[in-house]
């Protein structure tokens, strides 16, 4: 099975124009997985989506994946560079 980072990369790369610039990292802090998604500023709108619908869907899919893999709670953070 794919790791959480690989799964996230597949999801986000499919919706952005510059998939080669995507960076995904994870950190385990106090039993919670912090997932950081870094994308270029000009594709940030694609990741967030209208009224945050796209990022909400991404977060939901990541949470479902974590549940299926018996991973702890995942907090998703999206930033631009």
Residue ranges, per PLM feature:
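RNA-contacting regions in translation and RNA-metabolism proteins
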Residues: 1-46, 56-81
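ATP phosphate-binding glycine-rich loop and adjacent ATP-lid/helix-beta elements
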Residues: 53
């Amino acid at each position: 099975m794919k790791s959480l980072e690989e799964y996230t990369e597949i999801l986000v790369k499919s919706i952005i124009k510059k998939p080669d610039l995507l960076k995904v990292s994870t950190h385990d802090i106090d039993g919670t997985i912090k997932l950081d998604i870094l994308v270029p500023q000009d594709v940030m709108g694609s990741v967030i989506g209208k009224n945050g619908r796209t990022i909400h869907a991404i977060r939901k899919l990541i949470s479902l994946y974590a549940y299926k893999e018996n991973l702890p709670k995942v907090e998703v953070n999206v930033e631009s560079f």
